[in-house]
């Protein structure tokens, strides 16, 4: 019959525990990594960092009057300033195009970008309202006096949306245009169309519906003298009106090729507008 000697069993357990414990100690001594998860860190979202960066530019810029173009928007505008997509490896945004065209102080196209990823219409409105009225006052500086303000806003309000969606977006754009003109009355506001998404239903029910209303908006007497509509939608669709996916990273945000197409259209517009003004 099989039996266990109590002394031998206890001795074996003690030896095993010592060996395992010693091995564990050695492993711990050899590799004791410091994990980020064990360190206290304040959470900072991208939009918070962008607000700080925008305020720093406004505070530290030696000559805000050098800014000729102002870009206002959400992530689609914000990502002009990204090279690599920080969330998806291998995707490129518009930084190279931006640096080539809009980042040179002293040039006629030197630009300041206040687009922030994730912003809805109401968030942009809060940022451009003066501090005296409870906003962030990002346009408060009298030195900031751009020649053109490029605006693309509203697509984020198509998610978790108020109903009717197109009405909500239209009213939000309207409020932002009025606020922009109140802050910078000498600027020509360029109201850009929403870009196509990869959702056919959203394009039909929201994007094209909003674009049609924005096109009509700039012809109203209130806006006619200082606002122009720039239709980018056809540049990003094929002959059937479907989004050209090769110009986008994810069906919503342009890739570097998409930003190049956008840039080229803006330069064409600027050349035409300045020529007309001179004549």
What function would you assign to each model-found segment?
Residues 106, 179-187, 216-228:
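A structural motif corresponding to the C-terminal end of an alpha-helix
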Residues 78-86, 118-170, 174, 179, ...:
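Oxyanion-hole/transition-state-stabilizing segment in secreted/luminal serine hydrolases
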Residues 13-22:
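Bacterial N-terminal signal peptides
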Residues 196-279:
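Catalytic His-Asp segment of secreted/periplasmic serine-dependent ester chemistry enzymes
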Residues 97-98, 169-176, 180, 206, ...:
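A general structural detector for well-ordered alpha-helical segments in enzyme core domains, enriched
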Residues 1-9:
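N-terminal secretory signal peptides that target proteins for export/translocation
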Residues 29-117, 122-144:
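Serine-esterase "nucleophile elbow" of acetyl-processing enzymes
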Residues 68-73, 110-115, 147-153, 188-193, ...:
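Structural recognition of the beta-strand scaffold that forms the well-ordered cores
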